[in-house]
């Protein structure tokens, strides 16, 4: 069952993937192994496909390092729940096919290590007997996810979903 990895407010792209581990520094095939190297050194070894990241306010602020969310995607992260997002980080998540949900209530309710199920289409998150309703992703994003990401969709169809 997917687990929650909970972080605090103001987690920036350098926290997610420190610059010294950028693809051009350590190699395109290894950079994701350093996700959260300074905050949670065990993260890259222990995260499993489908696990969910939970952030507080202003998730992903800082420089526009697309390789930070790319590292998360390579590790199997499919969704993030935050109180709020930095705009560029939010857009990079959408482009890469990681679903960004936003909910103060759910962030406050979840704890690090919780086991949860998340239906990406409906936005329903289940923890034991509890159910939380997140705003479901827009139809264009769900369509893009069928191909892997918004970028993958564009490469295959030569247009964006809904055009």
UniProtKB/Swiss-Prot annotation:
Is not inhibited by lysine. GO terms for molecular function: 3-isopropylmalate dehydratase activity; homoaconitate hydratase activity. It catalyses: (2R,3S)-homoisocitrate = cis-homoaconitate + H2O. It comes from the Bacteria. SUPFAM superfamilies: LeuD/IlvD-like. Optimum pH is 8.0. It is an enzyme of class 4 (lyase). This is Homoaconitase small subunit.
């Amino acid at each position: 069952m997917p687990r929650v990895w909970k972080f605090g407010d103001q987690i920036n792209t350098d926290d997610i993937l420190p610059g010294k581990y950028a693809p051009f520094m350590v190699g395109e095939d290894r950079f994701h192994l350093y996700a959260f190297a300074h905050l949670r050194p065990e993260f890259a070894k222990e995260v499993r496909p489908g696990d969910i990241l939970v952030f507080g306010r202003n998730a992903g602020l800082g420089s526009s390092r697309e390789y930070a969310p790319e590292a998360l995607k390579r590790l199997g992260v499919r969704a993030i729940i935050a109180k709020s997002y930095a705009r560029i980080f939010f857009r990079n998540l959408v482009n890469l096919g990681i679903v960004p949900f936003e909910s103060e209530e759910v962030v406050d309710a979840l704890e690090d290590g919780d086991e949860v199920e998340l239906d990406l289409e409906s936005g329903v998150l289940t923890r034991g007997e509890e159910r939380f309703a997140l705003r479901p992703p827009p139809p264009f994003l769900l369509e893009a996810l069928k191909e892997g990401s918004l970028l993958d969709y564009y490469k295959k169809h030569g247009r964006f979903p809904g055009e």
